Amino acid sequence: CLSKKNNYFLAGGVIDLEKNIWIGLMEDYDGDHIVSYSLEKTYQQPNFIYSSQGLLGYLALNSNDNKLAWIEWTKTSMPWDLNELKLAKLNEKGNIIRTVSFNNEYFKLKEKISFFNPVWSEKGDLYVAEDSSGWWNITQIKTDTDNKPIVISQNKWTIQVEIAFPQWVLGMSSFSCVGDDVVGAFAKDGVWSLALFHNNGSIQIIDQPFNEFSGLYSNQNRLVAISSSSVISEGIFEIDLLDKSWEHTPASSVILDPKEISIGESFWFTGSNEDKVHAWYYPPLNSQISLPPLLVKSHSGPTGMARCGLDLEV
């Protein structure tokens, strides 16, 4: 065990093989911190790299250039409303030398801005989802060796979809870098699709049968994710991004006849304050029951989303 038993929680870590250390998030009675542990020792006290007055999440390490990125927000804000992207330069021991903060003031915006899922490319560019356009789209940030931003490409891929999830838990990922390109999942009208976002600004939709994605990670030209469809239960999805061949391993087998599974029909209706609300209607479909029951599910929270993947609990 790397750490001594104590009154704190560790999560969201990354491994720096160059320095042979684990860098991760720690929560204790004083707040949130970024800490490190040597991979060559056991039962250590944490090495404190950074301490926050607020909350931390989504570490992204570029060990080749000694750079670390993360998301930070105050305790009075929800992370999907307002947060900051922090970019730090590390020394040879893994301690922070300097940081740069990206927020609505940096981008000269009066509106609140939210960042999600910072990811480093092989070339050392930082990609992050942010909603300055009103949609969570991907922004590219190029920095110099001192960690100073030199080029920020906002709205490189202009598309009115959400390429992010509300930050309720650690470990979520909606896109990943593949060479000069980005592969990611995006939501439109409650349906998730998979696409390649090419460096030249074009977007290529990947043809496949799934409409729910989460936990996207890539290695070279292969992508893995958790996916499901309206008739296929949730499982591990793997795709070769060169020839687009894919495999799906369900977590459990579906014992229902596909003819007995109702397919959701997307529709919009007018809710309170004349706001438009999206929903899914599942028409009754069951040959064994003459009068199928009516089930209505709703969520009044700020980030609830009606999904169309197969859910056998419903």
Task: Outline where the language-model segments fall.
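Short glycine/serine/proline-enriched coil/turn segments at secondary-structure junctions
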Residues: Y29, T76-P79, G94, P258-K259, ...
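A flexible loop/linker signature enriched in serine peptidases of the S9 family
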Residues: K4-F9, L25-I34, Y50-L55, I71-K86, ...
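Residue-level detector of Asp-centered blade-edge/turn motifs that repeat once per structural unit
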Residues: L17-E18, S63-N64, S121-K123, C177-G179, ...
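Hydrophobic beta-strand positions that form the internal "hydrophobic ladder"
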Residues: W22, L68, D125-Y127, V182-V183, ...
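Serine-hydrolase catalytic core recognition
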Residues: V119, Y217-R222, I226-V314
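Multi-bladed beta-propeller domains
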Residues: C1-F9, V35-G57, A88-S121, I141-S173, ...
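Short, low-complexity Ser/Thr-rich regulatory SLiMs
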Residues: S63, L90, Y281-L285
